[in-house]
């Protein structure tokens, strides 16, 4: 399988998806036809989100079609060489994808050679479940099981920083709480600016920041760019 799972879409001082464009270009391998799944968009319309994505990817020669615009979404997925899932609200993304019965066809198409690109919520959707999302508002997606293309749970936008005087939990504390009730999970705290690239059966960590791996009953493990999962 070919996956590009990004923690986020924007870095300080850079345009939207700018940091991701070289990564995407490097993994295209001649692919040009893409479907975009915009359902995580809540404060922007799906048309706006699709047009924005198409515009930024056009210089790479990628032709983007919004999945919500086609008469036969399953046929569009089958024909697609690239499946792109945008960030936003993970619950809304999973709900809409499940209601349209897109999860199994997307997973099957990626397993048969389509490149999967997802940032933030799109990276969450590639995991076994969406139980490590950060998102609100919460809508009922009728179950948390997701695409299960990547075997570990990703927590995107990972940071352990708290504003001065803030008394809420750190991100690590919240992940630790999850591991109490679901000790079978392994969670990757993926900071902004980092990504996981899967190609030829190898998953490789990229990005400038330390990534953390959390398991029940164990100390967190720090990983740097180049680590192979």
From Swiss-Prot:
One of its GO terms (biological process) is proteolysis. The keyword Cytoplasm applies. The active site is at residues 120, 135, 157. It catalyses: Dipeptidase E catalyzes the hydrolysis of dipeptides Asp-|-Xaa. It does not act on peptides with N-terminal Glu, Asn or Gln, nor does it cleave isoaspartyl peptides. It comes from the Bacteria. It is an enzyme of class 3 (hydrolase). GO terms for cellular component: cytoplasm. Keywords: Cytoplasm, Dipeptidase, Hydrolase, Protease, Serine protease. Its main location: cytoplasm. It is found in: Cytoplasm. GO terms for molecular function: dipeptidase activity; serine-type peptidase activity. Its EC number is 3.4.13.21. InterPro entries: Class_I_gatase-like, Peptidase_S51, Peptidase_S51_dipeptidase-E. Belongs to the peptidase S51 family. Hydrolyzes dipeptides containing N-terminal aspartate residues. May play a role in allowing the cell to use peptide aspartate to spare carbon otherwise required for the synthesis of the aspartate family of amino acids. This is Peptidase E.
């Amino acid at each position: 399988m070919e996956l590009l799972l990004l923690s986020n879409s924007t870095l300080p001082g850079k345009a939207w998806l700018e940091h991701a464009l070289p990564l995407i270009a490097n993994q295209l391998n001649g692919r040009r036809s893409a479907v975009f799944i915009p359902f995580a968009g809540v404060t922007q319309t799906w048309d706006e989100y699709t047009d924005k994505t198409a515009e930024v990817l056009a210089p790479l020669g990628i032709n983007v079609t919004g999945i919500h615009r086609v008469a036969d979404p399953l046929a569009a997925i089958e024909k697609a060489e690239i499946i792109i899932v945008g960030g936003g609200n993970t619950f809304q993304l999973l709900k809409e994808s499940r209601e349209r019965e897109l999860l199994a066809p997307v997973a099957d198409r990626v397993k048969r050679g389509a490149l999967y690109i997802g940032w933030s919520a799109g990276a969450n959707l590639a995991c076994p479940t969406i139980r490590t999302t950060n998102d609100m508002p919460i809508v009922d997606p009728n179950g948390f099981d997701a695409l299960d293309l990547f075997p570990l749970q990703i927590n995107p936008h990972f940071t352990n920083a708290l504003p001065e005087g803030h008394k809420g939990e750190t991100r690590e504390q919240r992940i630790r709480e999850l591991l109490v009730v679901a000790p079978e999970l392994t969670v990757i705290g993926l900071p902004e600016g980092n990504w996981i690239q899967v190609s030829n059966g190898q998953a490789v960590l990229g990005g400038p920041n330390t990534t953390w791996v959390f398991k029940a009953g164990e100390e967190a493990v720090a990983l740097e760019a180049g680590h192979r999962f």
